[in-house]
């Protein structure tokens, strides 16, 4: 069904990893073979992976096979805040940064699934870290995601009692957009057509 979908559907996209089925990079060899087989039959459509970005070498192998885009989930652009929440096993925050950089080196589309928590996400420290992440990775898109989490639990887990100086969320977004005009904001992984012409209305 995958190849006919990519061949005939309007603005087709397929994804590995949907957030509720485990980390797809743990099966990257299988995914690579699947992408190779798909691309034997069609070059149409976009192949995406939703991931924690923990294996840059695996991401590179998938890009070589024909992957088009990646979405890496993170609660923060700061290594310490990321680590307290994700408690990564056998990888570090630096690995997800490298995965984003790998995708851009292959001219792919790189997004972060950015869990947005007012009082943390819009702190001045986070804003500065996000700017640095965008510059370092050449990020294509931020998917600003409402962080559906118990706030008391989260702040306790982060060990945060004072978030420091904060911007408003709209102000932070406006400042990021002004500094990085090529960076896109959104909520979903775009199809290949929208990657090329992002401001075109593809909903109708």
Predicted regions located by residue number:
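Alpha-helix-loop-beta-strand connector modules within alpha/beta enzyme cores
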Residues: 29-42, 94-107, 163-185
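Structural motif
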Residues: 65, 106, 136-137
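Core AdoMet radical
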Residues: 1-33, 39-58, 65-96, 140-143
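Conserved strand-turn element in the central/C-terminal portion of the radical SAM core barrel
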Residues: 86-89, 99-126
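Generic structural signal for hydrophobic
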Residues: 38, 62, 103, 133-134
């Amino acid at each position: 069904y995958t190849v006919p979908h990519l061949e005939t559907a309007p603005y087709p996209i397929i994804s590995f990893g949907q957030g509720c089925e485990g980390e797809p990079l743990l099966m990257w060899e299988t995914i690579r073979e699947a992408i190779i087989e798909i691309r034997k039959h069609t070059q149409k459509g976009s192949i995406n992976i939703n991931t924690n970005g923990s294996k840059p070498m695996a991401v590179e192998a998938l890009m070589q096979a024909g992957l088009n885009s990646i979405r890496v989930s993170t609660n923060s652009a700061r290594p310490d805040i990321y680590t307290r929440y994700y408690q990564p096993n056998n990888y570090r925050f630096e690995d997800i940064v490298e995965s984003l950089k790998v995708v851009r080196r292959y001219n792919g589309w790189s997004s972060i699934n950015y869990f947005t928590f007012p009082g943390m996400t819009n702190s001045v420290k986070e804003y500065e870290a996000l700017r640095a992440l965008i510059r370092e990775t050449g990020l294509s898109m931020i998917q600003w995601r409402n962080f559906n989490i118990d706030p008391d639990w989260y702040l306790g887990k982060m060990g945060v009692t004072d978030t420091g100086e904060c911007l408003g969320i709209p102000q932070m977004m406006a400042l990021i957009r002004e500094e990085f005009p090529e960076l896109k904001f959104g909520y979903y992984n775009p199809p290949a057509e929208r990657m090329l012409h992002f401001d075109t209305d593809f909903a109708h």
